[in-house]
């Protein structure tokens, strides 16, 4: 469902949709499939797109382990500046994630810096 999110880039992200979630907060379940879909306008020409997912736990941002980082597996690369991108990322929630509430920052990074960035609240069960 549609998530409320904070843009942490330059306003590129127009929509964020996460399986079985909506509103301010998302509860995700370890070992279960998860689909995150983000719509944004590409702010640069890039040959690559690297996925970075950070969870802020006790005030410290830590990289979420066990996730695919090659964004070109989910969106056609190279990307041209101005292209409308529909980025659909499907994964299984890593079983090693601790059961905590956290603010998550998801970034897609291109050759020239951040392509898109969104923050949202989530809890792992």
Swiss-Prot record:
Secreted as a keyword of this entry, yes or no, is yes
List UniProt keywords, sorted A-Z.
Answer: Allergen, Secreted
Checking Gene3D superfamilies in the record gives: 2.60.40.770
What GO molecular functions are on record for this protein? sterol binding
GO BP, one annotated term: sterol transport
One GO CC annotation: extracellular region
- The answer to whether UniProt assigns keyword Secreted to this entry is yes
Protein location: Secreted
InterPro entries membership: Ig_E-set, ML_dom, NPC2-like
Disulfide connectivity for this sequence is none
Q: Which family does it belong to?
A: Belongs to the NPC2 family.
PANTHER family named in the record: NIEMANN PICK TYPE C2 PROTEIN NPC2-RELATED, NPC INTRACELLULAR CHOLESTEROL TRANSPORTER 2
Give the protein name, as stated in the record.
Answer: Mite group 2 allergen Gly d 2.02
Species assigned in the record? Glycyphagus domesticus
């Amino acid at each position: 469902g549609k998530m409320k999110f904070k843009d942490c880039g330059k306003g590129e992200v127009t929509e964020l949709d996460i399986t079985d979630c909506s509103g301010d907060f998302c509860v995700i379940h370890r070992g279960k499939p998860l689909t995150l879909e983000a719509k944004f306008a590409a702010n640069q020409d890039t040959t690559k797109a690297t996925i970075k997912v950070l969870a802020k736990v006790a005030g410290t941002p830590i990289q979420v382990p066990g996730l695919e980082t090659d964004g070109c597996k989910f969106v056609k690369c190279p990307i041209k500046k101005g292209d409308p991108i529909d980025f659909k990322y499907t994964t299984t929630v890593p079983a090693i994630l601790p059961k905590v509430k956290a603010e998550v920052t998801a970034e897609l990074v291109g050759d020239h810096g951040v392509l898109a960035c969104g923050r949202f609240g989530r809890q792992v069960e």
